[in-house]
Amino acid sequence: QCAELDSDNCPHYAAAPGPLGRWIYGREARRLLAFEDRVARAFSRSFVVSEVERELFRRCIPGVEPDVLPNGVDVEHFRSAGDADRDPHGAVFTGVMDYEPNVDGVRWFVARCWPALRARFPAARLWIVGSRPTPAVRALGDVPGVTVTGRVEATPPWFDRAAVAIAPLRLARGVQNKVLEAMSMALPVVASPQAAQGLGDL
């Protein structure tokens, strides 16, 4: 089996305001970890995507030793077509936009970082590219300089429009495909420590 310990996210979600939310996510973490433990022990081999994930696995499910099988990226698909359409003030964020870590990360970035960037660079543009944007994500399209695309046929053209890719995730583990894809496109990436933690020395 290829494993990801989603139970590790629950304590982060439990930081949400309100005692009910904390209770729900605390309970969910315990139940999910018990399920993950049963599944891991039912398989003869387990694989994780990074050394960070392996250490987490060892800590949470003692006695089961996973192997590391890193994520890959299709370098032919994620290949830059050149700079003809590149906006020197453009930034791009990619991901499924009803996934809570993506929603949290991009909302935090627009609230905490974007105003200062726009004040310094009035022509700055941010493209939030990905399917199923929540109402909260769609609302970011009302912020000056921000465009929420919804689903697109392919992300490489959007990488080619931008001067930088961002990955401001606060709830993240493993290796982020959005980071690998941007790197494959030869695009600089500004990532949070959480989004970069599975990349080792890259």
Predicted regions and their residues:
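Acceptor-binding helix/loop patch of EC 2.4 sugar-transfer enzymes
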Residues: Q1-A34, V96
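Generic beta-sheet signal
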Residues: Q1-C2, V49, L69, V129, ...
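Short, acidic/turn-prone active-site loops that include or flank metal/cofactor-
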Residues: C2-S7, N71-D74, R151-E153, A195-A196
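Conserved catalytic-core segment of nucleotide-activated headgroup transferases in glycan assembly
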Residues: P19, L56-R59, D67-R161
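Short acidic/histidine- and often glycine-rich active-site loop of Leloir-type glycosyltransferases
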Residues: P193-L202
